[in-house]
Amino acid sequence: MDFFYPNWLNDFWRIMGLIFLGGKQALEAEGEKRFDQEKVIRFATEHGLAFFDTAQKVCRTKDNASDQFLEIQEPTDVGSLLSHIPSCTQVVTTGGKASEELLVQTDAGAIPAVGTCTICHIGPRKIRWWRMPSTSRAYPMKIERKAEHYRMIFQSEDFPKADSGR
């Protein structure tokens, strides 16, 4: 996988297109059922987006993409990861398993409700932690509503305005 969310059936890049580029097809390869990798990478770079998993090693206990069948064998040390990204002020989780893993690495008392955030520390860093709806089409929410949730991240006071495309 050369970039995050390459699956044609996942709506993450369509949501970004709706928020920033005037339409959900903006990051698709014209006339093809795939996302344009060059457009995606350029967009993520221009908007200061970085991606990483909360697990380095996982085991699927069943042949199913659901979090309930995912066992984290080696979690990512998110505090260490953030030490290499000093300008990062916000972290987003979408899945339940990722949120559960991040919770144990923070001083947050609970996982934020979907569509909300909390201020917490990951290691010594003060971070705004957002819990967003899954961009999978299996998650029962219209893409436009998901985009409304994600738009809040980019409108928050912590998001770097110079790189946000506004």
How does the language model describe each region?
Residues 42-44, 84, 122:
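Generic structural signal for beta-strand residues in well-ordered domains
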